[in-house]
Amino acid sequence: MDIDTKIKAYRFVAYSAVVFSVIAVLSVCITLPIVYNYVHTVRRQLHNEALTCKGSMKDVWADVHHLRVDAASNRTARAVRYGRDDAAAGNGPNFDSGCEGCCQPGPQGAPGAPGKPGRPGKPGAPGFPGNPGKAPQKPCEEITPPPCKPCPQGPPGAPGLPGDQGDKGEAGQPGQPGSDAAPGEQGPKGPNGAPGKPGAPGAPGDEGLPAVCEPVQKGEPGSTGEPGPVGPPGPSGQPGNDGTPGQPGPKGPPGPDGKPGADGNPGQPGPVGPPGTPGERGICPKYCAIDGGIFFEDGTRR
C-alpha cells in the first residue's frame, strides 16, 4: 500500500474511534441518570407498598384479636340431655329449658388496646364565597358632641407642594384660514436680458478723402526673443590616438588541477635485495585416534 493510503486509513480509524468514544460517553451520561431515577422510583414504590402491607397485616391481626376476645366473652354454656332417643337419632342436641337461669354471661372483659390512629382524610372542598357585607346603619339617635368653647380661627397653613403634571390634553380643532396679506413693495431690478438679434446692414457711406503720403519712419528695435530649441547632434569626430599601456594587474588565483599526464618510461631495475629469513621446516602430520590430536615429527603439537 502507498503511504498516503495508509495515512488516510489510519486517520479514518482514529476519527471513527473518537466519534464512537464520544457517542458512548454521551450515552452513558444520559442513560445513567435515567436508570438511577427509575431504580429509585421503583424502590420507593416497593417501600411504600411494604409499609402498606405491614399496616394492613397489623389491622387484620387486631381484628382477629378483637374477634377472639368477643367470642370468649359471649360464649354460652350448653347442656345436653344424655340418654334420649331423639339425640341419638340425629335430631340435634336439645337444650334444657329449666337451666336458663344458670346460663348467664360472665362479667365484661377488660377494654382492649387502643387502635391505630386513622389515616388523615382528604382535604375538604373549598367553601362558597361569603355574602357581601352590608353598610353600617346609622344609629337611631345621633350622638351630638359636647359643646366646646369657640376658638378664634387659626392662621392659614403653609402652601402645599405643587401637584404632578396633568395629562396631555386632546388636540384642538384647526383654526380658521387667515385673511389675505397686503400687496408687497416693488422688487429689485432683474438681470439683463439676452442680447437681441443683429440688425439689418446699413446703407453705404460717402467716399472718404484721399490719403496723404508721409515718409515712413523706422520703429525702435524689439526685445530679444527666447532661445531656440536645441539643434540635432553633429556628426561623429575622428578616432583619437591610442593611449599608453597600463601597468600589469595583480596575479590571479591558481587555476584548477590539470588532467594527470601519461605514464613515464619504465626505470632501470633496482639493486638486489638482502637475503630473506630461512623458511619453516616442512611437516608430516601423524594422526593419533586415541588422543584426537595431530602430532608432528619434531614432537610439537599444534
Curated annotation (Swiss-Prot):
Triple-helical region: region residues: 106-135, 154-210, 219-278
Taxonomic source organism: Caenorhabditis elegans
Described purpose of this protein according to its UniProt entry: Nematode cuticles are composed largely of collagen-like proteins. The cuticle functions both as an exoskeleton and as a barrier to protect the worm from its environment. Mutations in dpy-13 affects the body shape.
Biased composition (Pro residues): 144-159, 247-257, 268-277
Subunit structure as annotated in this protein's UniProt entry: Collagen polypeptide chains are complexed within the cuticle by disulfide bonds and other types of covalent cross-links.
Family named by the database record: Belongs to the cuticular collagen family.
Superkingdom: Eukaryota
GO annotations of cellular component type: collagen trimer; cuticular extracellular matrix
Source species taxonomy: Eukaryota, Metazoa, Ecdysozoa, Nematoda, Chromadorea
GO molecular function: structural constituent of cuticle
TM helices/strands, residue ranges: none
Residue span of region Disordered: 108-284
InterPro entries: Col_cuticle_N (IPR002486), Collagen (IPR008160)
Compositional bias segments (type: Low complexity): 188-197
Coiled coil region boundaries: none
Pfam families tied to this protein: Col_cuticle_N (PF01484), Collagen (PF01391)
Signal sequence segment: none
Keyword line: Collagen, Cuticle, Disulfide bond, Repeat
GO BP annotations, alphabetical order: cuticle development involved in collagen and cuticulin-based cuticle molting cycle
Name the record gives this protein: Cuticle collagen dpy-13
